[in-house]
Swiss-Prot record:
The keyword Metal-binding applies. This is E3 ubiquitin-protein ligase ICP0. Residues 351-361 have a biased composition (Polar residues). The gene is BICP0. It holds the Pfam family zf-RING_2. Residues 474-484 have a biased composition (Pro residues). It comes from Bovine herpesvirus 1.2 (strain K22). InterPro entries: Znf_RING, Znf_RING/FYVE/PHD, Znf_RING_CS. A zinc finger (RING-type) spans 13-52. One of its GO terms (molecular function) is zinc ion binding. Auto-ubiquitinated. The strongly acidic region might serve as a transcriptional activation domain, possibly regulated through phosphorylation by casein kinase II. Its EC number is 2.3.2.27. Keywords: Activator, DNA-binding, Early protein, Host-virus interaction, Inhibition of host innate immune response by virus, Inhibition of host IRF3 by virus, Inhibition of host mitotic exit by virus, Inhibition of host RLR pathway by virus, Metal-binding, Modulation of host cell cycle by virus, Modulation of host ubiquitin pathway by viral E3 ligase, Modulation of host ubiquitin pathway by virus, Phosphoprotein, Repressor, Transcription, Transcription regulation, Transferase, Ubl conjugation, Ubl conjugation pathway, Viral immunoevasion, Zinc, Zinc-finger. It is an enzyme of class 2 (transferase). It catalyses: S-ubiquitinyl-[E2 ubiquitin-conjugating enzyme]-L-cysteine + [acceptor protein]-L-lysine = [E2 ubiquitin-conjugating enzyme]-L-cysteine + N(6)-ubiquitinyl-[acceptor protein]-L-lysine.
Length: 676
């Protein structure tokens, strides 16, 4: 016997997923399968693998409309015209049809018994003994109905148990407990949870929390015991009761089996749905060349939509480079290998995508250029260039010539600007080179000039203020006042005002100078004592002429002969220190102990070194030096304090007279020395 011929024009078989060999069609749906595959399938499942319709017969070896072979199938209509009710139940297609009555009639209509009884009654009513015949007929009919009902119930229970056993043995989905939120452990267990809740609500009067706890317990025991009805019944006895537990467990297992079974609906063939529909689309590996058949129309459309079609691929011959023109060859020779690729694209303005809108790309000035002291950015910002490989660069404007290094160094120098310097070399060189850098400007001003702005208001105000200060003429120094002599007298009496007192008249100096040798310390002391006499005696103030005469006489006496130096010490070479009373050391030490604590206090050696080259003095230093000189003179001349050092501090040119000594003398001696 020749092997069955293949029929690739019919597509692939949904059972073996191969080309159909020995085509056979199921009646009445006319779905095509392999003859061997569909016969094995129908041995335990009298339904079509595609549409789940009951199969009446198989048609194969079709030569024409009148020449074919037919194989009857047990799943077709029986002699009484009824269909097999177990097919849809086994494969779980009637989940939404409600609970299944396992005791329903298997092959008879619900009114079959009634019709038979009515027929018997009508036949018996014709004779004289119709009543008795009708009674016998009703009794016989009732007996037959009871026997049929018991048989149908037994067959239904056996079918349900057989279905549960088949699901437990075959491949199925796992049974899972509920989640912590009292939900089903998997989506396919939702109907099991709903059935358990309905059964518990119909049996017990419980609250929502109690119902959730009981449902979780039932689902946990179902996941633990599985399809073991004895173990599950023992676990349900404390909750349901010993009498009701077996029936509850049998119904629970039947509902769970319907939800976890795996039917042939997971094997959707190529012809079950159009392209783009739901289901798994299997690839057609046949070598069919027929294009005119209707069955192949689905294959052609699926080939274009499956993503595996090679019709849109580029052939190898089409990937060769196009011949270049003479212009392109010349352009590549002049600009290099990358120039030829960029020359194929027109010079267009570059754009950047901003969520659907096309806006010109703007390239801001980088901040790194603003931080450089000598800017390198061009005066005019260049247009953005294309970042794509082989793109043409946009033309750039030529940059301004850069200033010479010497000019840049002078522009960046920190020296102050002179009159008219703002418009001079530094600003001109900086603006020409394209970077705004001034001689005293900071980072903010350089950044403002680089960005083409005048800068913030505070920067503008600081720039104007510095310019005004630099351009303002320098005032001429004021002439220093003549130094006041140390011998200027001050009225130191208790009730006298703190004002200078004139020295004694020249006539009063004669007796004092008569007994003293000119140029000796005794003569100088006599002159000083005579000058202080009017102040102590509260005399009248002499005229300025007398004061000038006394001052000149004392200076002449002190300069006629040099002051003899101590033994073993050379005479002083400084004319300022020659002939002056050397009381500066003691005065400085005493002033430091009494009224000069802190930063202005210096040792005597440092002050002595400063006397040789005093340098410029501040107003505070001059005032302090004057106070120390007057205090030293007061202690030596009036209080009789012995000298401690021969170093004397001569008056400096340009110095000025210190303040009044009333406060100083009152702080030193309390004023008691002057009232005695």
């Amino acid at each position: 016997m020749a092997p069955p011929a293949a029929a690739p024009e019919l597509g692939s078989c949904c059972i073996c997923l191969d080309a159909i060999t020995g085509a056979a069609r199921a009646l009445p749906c006319l779905h095509a399968f392999c003859l061997a595959c569909i016969r094995r399938w129908l041995e335990g499942r009298p339904t079509c693998p595609l549409c789940k319709a009951p199969v009446q017969s198989l048609i194969h070896s079709v030569a024409s409309d009148e020449c074919f072979e037919e194989i009857p199938v047990g799943g077709g209509p029986g002699a009484d015209g009824a269909l097999e009710p177990d097919a849809a139940v086994i494969w779980g297609e009637d989940y939404d049809a409600g609970p299944i009555d396992l005791t329903a009639a298997d092959g008879e209509a619900p009114g079959a018994g009634g019709e038979a009884g009515a027929a018997g009654g009508s036949e018996a009513g014709g004779g004289a003994g119709g009543a008795e015949a009708a009674g016998e007929a009703r009794g016989a009919g009732a007996g037959r109905a009871a026997g049929a009902a018991g048989g149908r119930a037994g067959r239904g229970a056996d079918a349900a148990q057989e279905f549960i056993d088949r699901v437990a043995r075959g491949p199925r989905l796992p049974l899972l407990p509920n989640t912590p939120g009292h939900g089903p452990g998997a989506p396919y267990l939702r109907r099991v949870v709903e059935w358990v809740e309905g059964a518990l609500v119909g049996t017990f009067a419980v609250t929502a929390r109690e119902l959730a706890a009981m449902t979780d317990y039932v689902m946990a025991m179902l996941a633990e015991c599985g399809f073991d009805d004895d173990g599950l019944a023992d676990a349900m006895e404390p909750l349901i009761g010993e009498d009701d537990a077996p029936a509850f467990v049998r119904s629970l297992l039947f509902v769970a089996a319907r939800c976890v079974t795996v039917g042939p609906s997971h094997l959707i063939p190529q012809q079950s749905a159009p392209p783009g529909g739901r289901g798994v689309v299997f690839l057609d590996t046949s070598d069919s060349d027929s294009e005119g058949s209707e069955d192949d129309s689905w294959s052609e459309s699926e080939e274009s939509s499956s993503g595996l079609s090679t019709s849109d691929l580029t052939a190898i011959d089409d990937t060769e480079t196009e011949p270049e023109t003479d212009a392109e060859v010349e352009s590549r020779r002049t600009r290099g290998a990358s120039g030829a690729a960029r020359a194929r694209r027109p010079a267009e303005r570059q754009y950047v995508s901003t969520r659907g809108r096309q806006t010109p790309a703007v390239q801001p000035a980088p901040r790194s250029l603003a931080r450089r002291p000598c800017g390198r950015a061009a005066a005019v910002s260049a247009p953005p260039s294309s970042r794509s490989r082989g793109g043409r660069r946009d033309p750039r404007l030529p940059a301004a010539p850069r200033a010479a290094p010497a000019a840049q160094a002078r522009a960046c120098s920190p020296e102050p600007r002179e009159e008219g310097r703002g418009a001079g070399l530094g600003v001109a060189a900086g603006e020409t080179a394209g970077w705004g850098v001034g001689s005293e400007e900071g980072r903010g001003e350089r950044r403002a000039k680089l960005l083409g702005e005048a800068g913030p208001p505070r920067v503008q105000a600081r720039r104007r203020r510095r310019t005004e200060l630099d351009r303002a003429p320098t005032p001429a120094p004021a002439p220093a006042p003549a130094p006041a002599p140390i011998s200027t007298m001050i009225d130191l009496t208790a009730n006298a005002p703190a004002r200078p007192a004139d020295p004694a008249p020249a006539a009063a100096l004669g007796p004092a100078l008569a007994g003293a040798q000119i140029g000796t310390p005794a003569a100088a002391a006599a002159v000083t004592a005579a000058a202080a006499a009017p102040s102590v005696a509260r005399g009248s103030a002499p005229s300025p002429a007398v004061t000038a005469a006394a001052t000149g006489t004392a200076a002449a006496i002190s300069t006629r002969a040099p002051t003899p130096s101590p033994a073993g010490r050379a005479p002083a070479a400084d004319p300022r220190r020659a002939g002056a009373p050397a009381l500066a050391g003691a005065a400085r030490a005493e002033a430091g102990r009494n009224g000069n604590p802190g930063r202005e206090r210096r040792p005597a050696s440092a002050m002595a070194r400063g006397d040789l080259d005093p340098g410029p003095e501040s107003s505070a230093q001059k005032r302090r030096r004057t106070e120390m000189e007057v205090a030293a003179w007061v202690r030596e001349s009036l209080l009789g304090t012995p000298r401690r050092s021969s170093a004397a501090l001569a008056p400096q040119p340009g110095g000025r007279q210190g303040p009044s000594l009333a406060g100083l003398l009152g702080r030193c001696s309390g004023g008691s020395a002057w009232r005695q």
